[in-house]
Structures are given as C-alpha cells and as structure tokens.
From Swiss-Prot:
Listed GO MF terms: CC tRNA cytidylyltransferase activity; CCACCA tRNA nucleotidyltransferase activity; metal ion binding; nucleotide binding; tRNA binding
Upper lineage: Bacteria, Bacillati, Cyanobacteriota, Cyanophyceae, Synechococcales
Cofactor: Mg(2+)
Catalyses which reaction(s): a tRNA precursor + 2 CTP = a tRNA with a 3' CC end + 2 diphosphate
Full protein name: CC-adding tRNA nucleotidyltransferase
Alphabetized SUPFAM superfamilies for the sequence: Nucleotidyltransferase (SSF81301), Poly A polymerase C-terminal region-like (SSF81891)
Keywords: Magnesium, Metal-binding, Nucleotide-binding, Nucleotidyltransferase, RNA-binding, Transferase, tRNA processing, tRNA-binding
Residues engaged in binding Mg(2+): D46, D48
Binding site for CTP: 31-34, 106-107, 111, 148-157, 188
Superkingdom as given in the UniProt entry: Bacteria
Organism: Synechocystis sp. (strain ATCC 27184 / PCC 6803 / Kazusa)
GO BP terms in the entry: tRNA 3'-terminal CCA addition; tRNA surveillance
Keyword field contains Mitochondrion: no
UniProt similarity note: Belongs to the tRNA nucleotidyltransferase/poly(A) polymerase family.
C-alpha cells in the first residue's frame, strides 16, 4: 500500500549520518524513495544521493566523520560510496544541468522520484508517484532503455519484485529493443536472471520476457513448454512441503541450498543436450557448481523412464551415485517435467535420499581400496574401483554384512 508522502520523513530515522553534512540540494533518489513510498523497509540500506557538485568530497567528509569505509566508484563521473555497518550510501554528481534532467535519464518513472531531506520535499517530474499508486512500471523514455539494454531485463525483474504490471507502451518498446540485450555483459545479465529464477513471482515474468524476445539470445532453446515447467517447479515445491514431514522438509531444503530452486529452473531454460547447455551456462559466466548441478539434472532425467518400472538395485545404485548431492535439484526438475504417473516414484527416490542410513542412497563401505591392496594384495588398478562397487551393491542386496564377508566376496570376484 502506498504511504502518504508525509511518511517520507520517517526516513530520517534511518539516516546513518548527520543530515547537516549534506549540501542543501542533495536528494535521495531511486529505489530507496520508491520503497519508502510503498512502505517497504529494508534491513540493509542501499541508498543513492544526487548532489549538484562535490559528490566525492561529500562522501569523503561523511566517511571521515564516522570512520566508515570510503570508495571512489567512478572518478570521472564523480561517484563515491560510504560503507556503514548496516548499509551503503552512494553519492553521485547529477547528470545534466538540474536534478530534473538527471531524473529524466532514469529507467522507470517509479525510480525517478527524489526526496530532499532538508526541505522535506518530494520531487517527482515524471509522475512516478501516480504509477506507484497504479502498481505500474512505466518507462521514462525509450532512449533511456536503449542506452542501457540491461534495463530491458530489469523491467521484468522489477515488475516481479514490486508485484507491478508493465505499462503496455513500455512493453511494446521492450519487444522492439529486445535484440539489444545481447550487447550487455554476461555477468550483469546473469544477476537479473538469478532474481527471476530464485523468486516464485519471477516465473510469470520469465514467461513474459520469453514472449517478448528478451531471452532469445541467451537461452535460444527455451520454448513455451520449458517456461511452463518453470512455473510447475513452484507447484512442485508446494507438493514437497505437503508430502514431507517437518523434519524431512528441513532436510530437503537444507540439502537443496539457497540457489537450489533457481538451479532447477535454470535447467529448464537451457537446452536438454548437456553439451549445448554447458555452452549456454559458460557464456553467462555461471559458476562450476551451477554448471555441475545442471549437468547432473540433465544427465539424470532420461534415466527415469528406465527406472520407473521395477528397477534393479544395481540401476538405482548407479543412479544415486551419479546424481549424488544434486538429487534434491533433480527431484524439483523431474516433478515439473514428468507425467504425473511418475511422481510417486520420484518421491520414493527422495525418501531414500532423505534417510541418511539408507544404503541405496548413502552406501556405507565395508572396506576401502587400501584394504584390498593390503589384505588381498591386489595391485592398484581400475579393478580396485570395480570391486568396491560390486561390494557396495552386494551389501545393499544383503549378500554380505561385514568386513570379512566383503573381503571374501572380493576374493571370489577376483578369481572370476
């Protein structure tokens, strides 16, 4: 709900320095003002001030006064940052001859609102407050989006973040400018994708971005089916919460990790061919962990059709070994992509995984390779690994249960 403009005075309580240190014309701009008007309070400050001149000097003086961190971000453009324990405050020299000209260069009207603390005055030349009231994201000007094409993708991210709609004229421009997204640095694009992939509200906006051609360059193999599957992953999360006990839910989400949901969705966006998918992810500068996670999901998925009907212990053993710690990510992906008749089997796999004592998902070796070398005098070779695998499978099947039986079993296998 939109707060009365008078409530902006509450921002004073959050200011981490004496307002008297600000030049009279200094204004807070951007997301901090927008969020205050929406009644959204941030635990960690991320503020931006615009000043007519002396931005670096102002930041330096405040940092010195409070023994805070100080970084010159862009000397040529006169931008500096003060780092406090609970947030950062950036100071930038205004672009243009006036504050209004500076605001006219911003991306969306809701981000082109300024607040002057000393005058307790809101400056809104782009009518951004009205768009906040309408819950609408509207461009300031098409040229502003063209000048920094990352803003094209940011439109969908901010619509998801704020739970806003996109102004129809703005969306038309986004479609027209979509090919320009390929000129943006991969790291910047990845950061925007990560928010959309990691948020339940991001799924519908990823679909919208795909429909508008924004994803075409980076995820050329994405189609309507894969975008719908991303939405189904959100439903899969709800199903998992309903199916598992409280303890199992905690185990699952701990194993999944903070990025697990985003990784399962990412696997839906890339090509199903593992090699092509690797290229797509490397181009976007994804980490080795994210790359390996997606590889495991895509390699494991085709095996489900072979496993669903009476799989052998051997088949399941190798399946769990290959997926390893990525099984929770796989489960999310599989629940979203598989026909419903596979779901009970997928939950069986998850039940095995969540039981730390389950021999199938978490084999407990009876002996080591060193035991085979020392006690059976087997020379180091690939045979060691093969024997250990067969011993693990025999243990799961109940054929052997202790070290002596394992050694005897290995000795017998070595003869054959």
């Amino acid at each position: 709900m939109l707060c009365p403009v008078s409530h902006l005075a509450d921002l004073r309580q959050q200011v981490p320095f004496d307002l008297a240190l600000l030049p009279p014309q200094a204004c807070l701009v951007g997301g901090a003002v927008r969020d205050a008007l929406l009644g959204r309070r941030r635990e960690y400050l991320d503020w931006d001030f615009v000043v007519p001149s002396g931005a670096i000097e102002t930041a330096s003086a405040i940092a010195s006064r409070y023994r805070a961190g100080f970084v010159v971000l862009d000397k040529a453009r006169h931008i500096a940052r003060v780092v406090f324990a609970h947030g950062t405050v950036d100071f930038a020299q205004q672009e243009g001859m006036s504050l209004e000209q500076d605001l006219a260069r911003r991306d969306f009207t809701v981000n082109a609102i300024a607040y002057n603390f000393q005058q307790n005055k809101l400056i809104d030349p782009m009518a951004g407050v009205g768009d906040l009231q309408r819950g609408q994201l509207k461009m300031v000007a098409a040229v502003n989006l063209a000048d920094d094409p990352l803003r094209l993708l940011r439109a969908y991210r901010q619509a998801a973040q704020l739970q806003f709609t996109l102004d129809p004229d703005t969306r038309t421009v986004l479609r027209e400018l979509a090919p320009r997204i390929k000129t943006v640095a991969a790291e910047r694009v990845q950061a925007e994708f990560n928010y959309l992939l990691g948020s339940p509200r991001g799924s519908q906006w990823l679909l919208a971005a795909w429909q508008d051609g924004i994803l075409a360059h980076w995820f050329s193999h994405a189609n309507l089916s894969s975008l719908n599957a991303i939405g189904c992953i959100d439903l899969a999360i709800a199903a998992i919460k309903n199916q598992l006990t409280l303890v199992e839910r905690q185990q699952f989400f701990q194993a999944l990790g903070k990025k697990g949901i985003a990784i399962a969705k990412l696997a839906s966006l890339v090509c199903a061919d593992v090699k092509i998918a690797e290229g797509e992810l490397q181009r976007l500068k994804y980490s080795r962990h994210e790359l390996r996670s997606v590889q495991a999901i895509l390699q494991g998925y085709p095996q489900l059709s072979c496993l669903e009907n009476s799989p052998t212990v051997r088949q399941l053993y190798f399946f769990f070994v290959e997926l390893g710690k990525y099984l929770p990510h796989f489960v999310l992906y599989a629940l979203a992509h598989c026909p419903h008749n596979y779901h009970s089997f997928i939950f069986e796999l998850l039940t095995h995984y969540l039981n730390s004592g389950d021999r199938l998902a978490h084999p407990q070796p009876l002996i080591t390779g060193k035991d085979l070398i020392d006690k059976l005098h087997i020379k180091p070779s690939p045979l060691i690994g093969q024997l250990l695998t067969e011993i693990n499978i025999a243990h799961i099947e109940g054929k052997i249960s202790n070290e002596q039986e394992a050694l005897a079993y290995a000795q017998e296998l070595g003869k054959s």
